[in-house]
Amino acid sequence: MAASTRALFLSCFHGSGGGGGTSEVSRRLVLRPRYPSMPRRPRSAAVAGEGGEGGGGGGDGDLEAAAVGAEEEEKVAVFEVSGMTCAACAGSVEKAVKRLQGIHDAAVDVLGGRAQVVFYPAFVSEEKIRETIQDVGFEAKLIDEEVKEKNILVCRLHIKGMTCTSCASTVESILQVVPGVQRASVALATEEAEIRYDRRIVTASQLTHAVEETGFEAILITTGDDQSRIDLKVDGTLNERSIMIVKSSVQALPGVEDIKVDPELHKITISYKPDQTGPRDLIEVIESAASGDLTVSIYPEADGRQQHRHGEIKRYRQSFLWSLVFTIPVFLTSMVFMYIPGLKDGLEKKVINMMSIGELLRWILSTPVQFVIGRRFYTGAYKALSHGSSNMDVLIALGTNTAYFYSVYSILRAASSHNYMATDFFETSSMLISFILLGKYLEILAKGKTSEAIAKLMDLAPETATMLIYDHEGNVVGEKEIDSRLIQKNDVIKVVPGGKVASDGFVIWGQSHVNESMITGESRPVAKRKGDTVIGGTVNENGVLHVRATFVGSESALAQIVRLVESAQMAKAPVQKFADQISRVFVPLVIILSLLTWLAWFLAGRLHGYPNSWIPSSMDSFQLALQFGISVMVIACPCALGLATPTAVMVATGVGASQGVLIKGGQALESAQKVDCIVFDKTGTLTIGKPVVVNTRLLKNMVLREFYAYVAAAEVNSEHPLGKAVVEHAKKFHSEESHVWTEARDFISVTGHGVKAKISGRAVMVGNKSFMLTSGIDIPVEALEILTEEEEKAQTAIIVAMDQEVVGIISVSDPIKPNAREVISYLKSMKVESIMVTGDNWGTANAISKEVGIENTVAEAKPEQKAEKVKELQSAGRTVAMVGDGINDSPALVSADVGLAIGAGTDVAIEAADIVLMKSNLEDVITAIDLSRKTFFRIRMNYVWALGYNIIGIPIAAGVLFPSTRFRLPPWVAGAAMAASSVSVVCWSLLLRYYKSPKLGR
């Protein structure tokens, strides 16, 4: 019955394609079948490469043509469907699902209660499929899914012109509705967008165009598929013929995926597979094809983001200085010269009826500030309003224009009247713009500091490298200095003392110590000799090294770290939603409050709600009310709220990276600061993860050198980790550098028990207790006592016998890390409970937990049981972090609120972990928790300041203190306060740059 059920289940998934037995169906299920039908796409969806840059055009035939060859690049979801009783039920479910757009295929198994759906996630979601099944009348639950993401890419855009959270929200919402976009995130602090998209539906250039249509300028940083891309500069004439020759020659090279030639910029962009070709090969082919007419070099590298940042700083500085040229005279004529008798008379001299020279002069001087220097605020306001949103620019434009145009109205009325005395606020609009420009200038300077960590990482790579040249016999015949970007895989690079390692690779000659602190955070130089790996960007301290390049360019560890930190700085913390929600209503609310403030004061003045003595001599009730209204409009600051979280996250992720703690974004930071329970794996986490010999007991009259010569000769052929540990230890007693051991004859290895061999005429056996007993060897009482003693200490005892007699016992252990006990103790002082979960036996587990000070231990746990323990703790209301090596701990790392992969080294792209600890140092666990807590303290203080500033500042600007103290906040002072609030938030976050990790023992 079971066999027939399985056959029916498999045949159900096989569909009606016919043919094939059960084994063929099984193979298809494992390999994800290629179904005969074409994927159906929405008719409105644009397909990349069809219909020009806009991506339009084409009917269903075009859409199907675009899908050819993409059948295997889909998402596969399996649903548990309950309630089906017959084939008709299965047929109705299958028919309903297949009717959805974006479904590749669907198969339903009525006996197993399963439905497998192959679909394109850009067009339909798992939730939509589940709802469709339920609409048919059955309960459905998603139980498994797999994505084949060859066509799913992530591109990054640098976006110019965003001034506040509202701008970022506008761009984000526009990107999220572009067909083919799965996810879009826009960060104001970094002025970048990260977009996950399906390249079959939309291109990176179309995404750039979508942003530019919102009124912002977008610069493509990376398309997601250009990890092996190079830009080459061409000196010489690029005509149609030479371009054709270059293209055909380059495309003939194995590994070349794409080539684009820009004759105007004299630039060639090539995408290639670094395993098959490299930049030097490409340059050589181009120059050879052009017969010497073209000279090719690496295109000057330029960081668009840094260039934009410097350009923005320069523009704001120039704008501010130019504004001062006009604003200072306006301020002097309205605030200072009016109190100097001689100057006052001259300024009050009438030129047209009641219009004075001073008023005319202020109008002339303030106009360039309002419309030329302040043009950026009009542009920003227009962009926001045209997309149905509002931002800080709207408030500034409204506030300054209200002051300016009322002043224009007032002096024009005076010019046409013989008795009207004008009152102008030209100094208000001019000084407002000047102070806001100053604030923006300081804010951009400060924001630039938040991304210094990435800039420093990128600067670690040396500009040049010394490449060794070999002859056909493998002898070094010369060396050549090349641009480090021209290094190809398998090149041999010479690294001199004090020089930087130019590429990831391994040492093929020489020995030295290398300072890796700038990459891993490891403070002590690491010894390197033949066979050891080195990391690009690290510093060689003493000896000369010859390094064979393995990972170059974007594949290097340094490039991976930079990408990870950049991605982390884009990821929003959940607490950021609070600021996003406020920003949606902030500006409209402030405008309403401003109007209500003006109306309340104006009506109170007209209805004699306050004494006339409250009104300054130079104003009337309307003008007093207007000043209060403008002050409310310009003091309100949504920018401080918008910058509170991302600036702190940016600095924290950069600081963490500099210490070898790679935090994957705001979500990880926010979860880590709540952790009150940490689950530790044992092997490789609390212990060093490598067995070492800790003790040797000789039971016969032998010297250690002779003893280990026999043992190593027997174990040298063993693949067991304990055998390797014994051989490594034996090298200490062996004088020959090559460590050539005596040849073993009649070698026999019994898996899990031991080895035996004939060495120099003696029968040598190395293994455990059972191996000796089954081999007929008597174990003396003294040896049995040692075995019991070692087991109690969680150490493995290896018995050595020669010629049927036990001659010694070797104790091997995976020792705990030197600071493990101190780390557990420190975590306890941080109110964090430590739990050990291991797959090892209870005896070893209890011994280790006792040694490090952990009270709660779970032993003999499989990987899935580790995850269950994490979930059990979470169900009890605990916030759980899991610390493991990222290999067999993946289920638990994923299940935990925060997964920390320790000892990752240069393998920083561990998907299961939220935080990657590059070193094997347990202190970094404390650093990760402590840094997250201090970061969120900063974030909370930022919010307290930003909210407190607005809650207190807006009422003061509205004149709440005026009745009792006659204190009022002039609009230009309110504007200065607004500018200062944003700067203060960024500066408060910048203090995280001076973070020092806790030191044990303090």
From Swiss-Prot:
This is Copper-transporting ATPase HMA5. The chain crosses the membrane at residues 320-340, 354-374, 392-412, 425-445, 585-605, 624-644, 943-963, 972-992. Expressed in root pericycle cells, xylem region of diffuse vascular bundles in the first node, and vascular tissues of peduncle, rachis and husk. Residues 32-63 are annotated as: Disordered. It is found in: Cell membrane. Residues 75-141, 153-219, 228-294 form the HMA domain. Keywords: ATP-binding, Cell membrane, Copper, Ion transport, Membrane, Metal-binding, Nucleotide-binding, Repeat, Translocase, Transmembrane, Transmembrane helix, Transport. One of its GO terms (molecular function) is ATP hydrolysis activity. Its EC number is 7.2.2.8. GO terms for biological process: detoxification of copper ion; transmembrane transport. It catalyses: Cu(+)(in) + ATP + H2O = Cu(+)(out) + ADP + phosphate + H(+). Signal peptide: none annotated. It comes from Oryza sativa subsp. japonica (Rice). It is a multi-pass membrane protein. Cu(+) 1 binds at residues 86, 89. It is an enzyme of class 7 (translocase). GO terms for cellular component: plasma membrane. CDD domains: HMA, P-type_ATPase_Cu-like. Copper (Cu) transporter that plays an essential role in promoting translocation of Cu from roots to shoots. Involved in loading Cu to the xylem of the roots and other organs, including panicles.
